[in-house]
């Protein structure tokens, strides 16, 4: 009887020991296999943000002190949201990628964009947006995470809030090489109430407050690019006027000098800048060049 109890006790102890070792082995494997983004980049596009407008905000003035930047970069013509973002991601003019209005009609010859170039090197991309055509900027693949917040039932201001929150939550738990955050509230305010109106500045400050929240959650190894697709005047955009074609670009990171201005810059330079930071070869057919300023 005693021997039987001892055997049962010994067996129970052995099972417990085996379970403990199994747990440690599983945890160890998870740690070993955890993906690591070596040089992560966050690109933020605040749709319709004029450089003279952000210059009039407290956060805009702060960015000028901690970033390499320009308030005089050029976007592409036509200065419309989807064509401009397609050029931002593919570093070619709309005449080459084929998207010349806010509908997705790409050229059959259109090459890789940021996400596709990264995916070929098994690098990860995540995009967060609240204007549905933005989904066309990347081709679906296993290395891309996409999150759309629909503004229709909740309004644009709340859609901005939820889009930024989704970005923060995802990056807390996932390693990503390239993250794109698109905020559409400002452009909608411009169309509804006019560029540089009181409502426009309200939307701008709300958007910048969200940018500040997102940036505050990131580790120091991130490089952060804050920009836009186009400007605007009156109640619209799309022309080749200075108010529509001039955009700001801010770059914050260890390899970018604080308070220094880029000599010249274009929306076409954003994609090659991102690949250069991450360490992936830039496609030869891209038209832009990496933005780089150091002390």
Question: Which residue stretches match the model-derived regions?
Answer:
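Bacterial N-terminal signal peptides
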Residues: 13-23
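Metal-dependent active-site segment of extracytoplasmic phospho-/sulfohydrolases and closely related
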Residues: 42-45, 59-62, 203-242, 249, ...
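Short, structured active-site-proximal loop/turn typified by the sulfatase FGly-forming signature C/S-X-P-X-R
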Residues: 51-85, 92
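Substrate-binding rim/cap in mid-to-C-terminal beta-strand-loop elements of soluble/periplasmic
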Residues: 84-90, 240-281
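Catalytic-site neighborhoods of secreted/periplasmic enzymes
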Residues: 95-158
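Active-site His/acidic residue clusters
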Residues: 138-141, 168-213
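Polar, surface-exposed loop/tail segments
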Residues: 280-295
């Amino acid at each position: 009887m005693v021997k039987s109890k001892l055997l049962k006790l010994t067996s129970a102890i052995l099972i417990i020991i085996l379970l403990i070792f199994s747990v440690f082995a599983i945890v160890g494997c998870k740690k070993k296999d955890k993906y690591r983004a070596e040089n992560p980049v966050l690109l933020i596009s605040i749709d319709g943000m004029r450089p003279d407008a952000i210059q009039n905000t407290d956060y805009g003035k702060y960015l000028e002190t901690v970033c390499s930047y320009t308030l005089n970069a050029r976007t592409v013509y036509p200065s419309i949201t989807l064509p401009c973002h397609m050029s931002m991601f593919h570093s070619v003019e709309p005449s080459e990628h084929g998207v010349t209005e806010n509908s997705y009609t790409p050229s059959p010859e259109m090459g890789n964009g940021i996400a596709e170039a990264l995916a070929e090197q098994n690098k990860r991309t995540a995009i967060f947006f609240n204007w549905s055509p933005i989904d066309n900027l990347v081709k679906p693949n296993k290395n891309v995470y996409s999150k759309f917040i629909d503004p229709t039932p909740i309004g644009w201001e709340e859609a901005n809030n939820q889009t930024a929150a989704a970005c923060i939550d995802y990056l807390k738990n996932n390693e990503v090489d390239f993250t794109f955050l698109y905020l559409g509230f400002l452009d909608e305010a411009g169309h509804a109430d006019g560029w540089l109106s009181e409502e426009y500045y309200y939307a701008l400050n709300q958007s910048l407050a969200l940018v500040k929240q997102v940036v505050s959650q990131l580790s120091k190894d991130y490089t952060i690019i804050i920009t836009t697709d186009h400007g605007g005047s009156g109640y619209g955009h799309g022309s080749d006027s200075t108010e529509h074609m001039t955009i700001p670009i801010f770059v914050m990171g260890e390899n970018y000098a604080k308070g220094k201005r880029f000599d010249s810059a274009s929306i076409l330079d954003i994609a090659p800048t991102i690949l250069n930071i991450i360490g992936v070869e830039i496609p030869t057919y891209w038209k832009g060049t990496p933005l780089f300023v150091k002390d």
